[in-house]
UniProtKB/Swiss-Prot annotation:
Subcellular location: Cytoplasm, Cytoskeleton, Actin patch
Free-text function comment from the UniProt entry: Functions as actin-binding component of the Arp2/3 complex which is involved in regulation of actin polymerization and together with an activating nucleation-promoting factor (NPF) mediates the formation of branched actin networks. Seems to contact the mother actin filament.
InterPro entries attached to this UniProt entry: ARPC2/4, ARPC4
Keywords in alphabetical order: Actin-binding, Cytoplasm, Cytoskeleton
Name the UniProt record assigns to this protein: Actin-related protein 2/3 complex subunit 4
A Pfam match: ARPC4
Assigned GO CC terms: actin cortical patch; actin cytoskeleton; Arp2/3 protein complex
Gene Ontology MF annotations: actin filament binding; molecular adaptor activity
Family, similarity comment: Belongs to the ARPC4 family.
Additional detail: Present with 9020 molecules/cell in log phase SD medium.
Superkingdom of origin organism: Eukaryota
Subunit structure, interactors included: Component of the Arp2/3 complex composed of ARP2, ARP3, ARC40/p41-ARC, ARC35/p34-ARC, ARC18/p21-ARC, ARC19/p20-ARC and ARC16/p16-ARC.
Gene name in the database record: ARC19
Length: 171
């Protein structure tokens, strides 16, 4: 893990731990319904808490939107060049197609972000909050590492193919 990634992930960890103090809150509009208030458009202001924006640089950001009974966390994965943009897009599409396996993963991310998670009070009741935070932090580390490894492999493969192609022209 790079030295600049460690403080970024630490800030995300502490912010998530603070935001995941969720409680059961019934809907104010529909009886016997409990819906994530952060997902409801035009919800009352007292149910939404102050959003937190944590940025490592202009290309890597986290938006944590807490409410009284849910937290939506959106990640912008690093996309320094066109290759990384393509890799991140393919990688996140692959994960979003398997959203059922990740209980907290949203199928469609917030516009401007690569991937989003939705954690409700039911998730914090059935799973340990510390383990949820650990999963998200480990997920962020793994995505960063995977994108870097795939990019290195892709560049090595392109170099090999270019050398093989150019060897045809050497006499």
């Amino acid at each position: 893990m790079s030295q600049s990634l460690r403080p970024y992930l630490t800030a995300v960890r502490y912010s998530l731990e603070a935001a995941l103090t969720l409680s059961n809150f019934s809907s104010q509009e529909v009886e016997r319904h409990n819906r994530p208030e952060v997902e409801v458009p035009n919800t009352s202001a007292e149910l939404l808490l102050q959003p937190m924006h944590i940025s490592r640089n202009e290309n890597e950001q986290v938006l944590i939107e807490p409410s009284v009974n849910s937290v939506r966390m959106s990640l912008m994965v690093k996309q320094a060049d066109e290759i990384e943009q393509i890799l991140v897009h393919k990688f996140t599409r692959f994960l979003e197609q398997r959203a059922e396996a990740f209980y907290i993963l949203r199928r469609v991310p917030i516009p401007g972000y690569s991937i989003s998670f939705l954690i409700t009070n039911k998730h914090t009741e059935s799973m340990k909050t510390g383990k949820l935070v650990d999963f998200i932090i480990e997920f962020m580390e793994d995505v960063d590492k995977e994108i870097s490894e795939i990019k290195l492999f892709l560049n090595a493969r392109a170099r090999f193919v270019a050398e093989a192609y150019l060897d045809e022209f050497v006499y």
